[in-house]
Structures are given as C-alpha cells and as structure tokens.
Amino acid sequence: MSLFSAVEMAPRDPILGLNEAFNADTRPGKINLGVGVYYNEEGRIPLLRAVQAAEKARIEAHAPRGYLPIEGIAAYDQGVQKLLFGNESELLAAGRVVTTQAVGGTGALKLGADFLKRLLPDATVAISDPSWENHRALFEAAGFPVQNYRYYDAASNGVNRAGLLEDLNALPARSIVVLHACCHNPTGVDLELDDWKQVLDVLKAKGHVPFLDIAYQGFGNGIEEDAAAVRLFAQSGLSFFVSSSFSKSFSLYGERVGALSIVTESRDESARVLSQVKRVIRTNYSNPPTHGASVVSSVLNSPELRALWEQELGEMRDRIRDMRLAMVEQLAAHGAKRDFSFVGRQRGMFSYSGLTADQVERLKTEFGIYAVSTGRICVAALNKSNLETITKAIVQVL
C-alpha cells in the first residue's frame, strides 16, 4: 500500500480555486470578479510609479541579497508602525509596539495565531459572519476553535449592530476577536467610529484580545481615515494585534509584503514579546524575503515617493468609487427591480452584491462571469469596457 493511498483530495480554495476555473475557461469574453486584485481601466494590474522608482534605485545601488534579520528590515517595520499608529504616536515613542515583517497579510495572521496559541492555548477565536474565508482556516490550523459573531444584516445591507455587540458579549472571557479595521472583506460594510467605541467597550469589559486585520488601508476613505480603528484601540490601554498587508495598496501581490504588529504594556514587555515572535518566525521560514519590503520601505520613508504613492493610491480609490456608482446606475438603467444603491455606500475593493449562489453559477455558465458563490464581487475589476456586459448579465439572472 502506498504511503499516500489514504490521502483524500482537498477541496478547492473558494477564491483561488475560482481563479483556476477561470484560467481553464476558453471563452474569449470571460470576466473574473472573484479574486481580490485591483485592475486599472485597461484591465491590467498596475505597476505603480512610486514602486518603479524605488525598484530602479535598488537595482542601481547593486544592493546585496544577504539574509535579513528574523524580524525583517528595521526601516520597513518602523514605516509600518507610523502608517498604522501615526507619526506622533505615544505608543511608538514609549516602545510599546512590536512589528515584524511577514510573508503577506496571511503570514502575519498565522504568526499572530501561532504566538497566541502559546499564550492562550484554551481561548476561543471569533470572526465576523461573513469574513474572509481564510480567517477561519488560519486560526483552526493554529489549533483554536473558531466561531462567528453576527456582523452583516442582509435586510438592511448594513451592520447588525445589536447582534454584533450581543455576540461579542456572549463570548467566553479572554476570547480572541478578529476584526476588519476597514474595507470589510467580503461585505464592504464598515463600522463607524461610534460603533468601534461600543465594540471596544465590550472587548475591555470581557477581557477579549483584539486582532485587527487591515489589508486595504487607503482604499476606504484615505490612509489616515482608514487607520481610525487602530488608533482608537491604541488609546484604549489594551494589548492587541494588527496584521497588515501591502499587496493591494502597493500593487505588489506576488511579493507577499505584510507585517504583524503587537501592542504591549511597556518597552520591556515589547522586548520579551519580540523574542518569542522571532522564535515563531524561525520555525516557520527563518527570515523574510528582501525585495518587496525594501521597495515599500523606500517609498514609505521617502517624502517624494510617499507623496507619489499616496496620489496613486487615491486615484485607485477614486476609480473604485466611480465604478460602484456607475454599477448602481447601469443596473437600474438595464431594468433591475432590486435597489442596488447600497453598493455605492460600501467601501474598499469588494461588494456583497446580494446575488445567490444559483445566480452566481448562472453568471459563470451562461455569461463567463466569475464571482464568489457568496455573491461577493471585486469592484476593482470593473471598468468602462466590461461594466455594461456585467450589469446586463446580472439583471438577466435576478
């Protein structure tokens, strides 16, 4: 009998598996609204000018490619901290934030999960309903039981505020609560500042451990605005975790540039926490890759490149907003009986469209339009050339 004879075929990843199916589709007019990637008006993944300039400078400098420290590039880690907590953060001045480079936002989440398993081995993890599909898998892989807290209200196309607070309050004390800091994936429906304050009150009262995931900073209302939840928590006195990613905001998907930040109570505590996180990193991948983080670091720490990047990110954010509004208009123009105005109020790269799994399947089989079975569509994949095709098809499957 073969060593692998009992190995079962794993189910396809709901998003990356969709991409595989899309690539295998030979129809010329196919459209991919599934994977979370920003495309420009020409339907291509852009190479940002700020990134090009940073890469050019790095190539011309003939920088060596030796091993990085376990925690990554120091200037990168510091740039991440300032982006999240602000240049004048009291936490940073007090040495109360530990940041390590990570292999994408996914890697940051897994590092945090593995470290938390050592700290709180019997804790429960709570994620929003719905949430990014990999949240559950990552924390279950670390050995945690994972449950949902209510978040999205389909009737109002908004946040189920009462259900959210009730469920957070009902969790066992010292639970780990994963929260989308901005641009909620998959719904595009965010908490407002007053909501965050109420959530924070419950977390403090119950002794929960917040784990903020921020993969889309700058795609909601702006770089500073999208960090509002992180900065509110920074003022709370709580210790908490933040996973962040630059895949989207720098259009560096294949470089896997992320970071894990942990807020502690003191500089001494930070040193001890960092030593343990480094142990987790060492047993996972030893140390992180150089190129992507060096590019991001160069941009964040150069006033000229930082300004150019913020301009380019603003242009991407504006294009997504324009596509949202145009989608709402065209759906109505093509005869949709349903009110889709909520799409225009959502933030970030995604929209929870309200389409059923059967309707999504019809979009794929009849029109070659791929979306996630939950009805999540990537608004960043819309453009003026494909919008009419997409909206007409949606109206036909309603």
Curated annotation (Swiss-Prot):
The record's Gene Ontology biological-process terms are: L-phenylalanine biosynthetic process from chorismate via phenylpyruvate
Query: For this UniProt entry, which segments traverse the membrane?
Result: none
- A Gene Ontology CC term for this entry? cytosol
Any one Pfam family here would be Aminotran_1_2
Kindly state which reaction or reactions the protein catalyses: L-aspartate + 2-oxoglutarate = oxaloacetate + L-glutamate
* Example GO molecular function: L-aspartate:2-oxoglutarate aminotransferase activity
Tell me the CDD domains matching this sequence.
Answer: AAT_like
E.C. code = 2.6.1.1
Keyword field? Aminotransferase, Cytoplasm, Pyridoxal phosphate, Transferase
Which InterPro entries does this UniProt record tie to the protein? Aminotransferase_I/II_large (IPR004839), Asp_trans (IPR000796), NHTrfase_class1_PyrdxlP-BS (IPR004838), PyrdxlP-dep_Trfase (IPR015424), PyrdxlP-dep_Trfase_major (IPR015421), PyrdxlP-dep_Trfase_small (IPR015422)
**What is its subcellular localisation?**
Cytoplasm
Positions carrying N6-(pyridoxal phosphate)lysine are 248
Needed cofactors, names only, are: pyridoxal 5'-phosphate
Q: Does the keyword Cytoplasm apply?
A: yes
Q: What is its main location?
A: cytoplasm
- Asked whether the keyword Transferase is assigned, the reply is yes
Q: Which residues bind L-aspartate?
A: 36, 132, 185, 376
Q: In which family does this protein belong, per the annotation?
A: Belongs to the class-I pyridoxal-phosphate-dependent aminotransferase family.
Subunit organization: Homodimer.
UniProt protein name: Aspartate aminotransferase
Q: Which organism is it from?
A: Pseudomonas aeruginosa (strain ATCC 15692 / DSM 22644 / CIP 104116 / JCM 14847 / LMG 12228 / 1C / PRS 101 / PAO1)
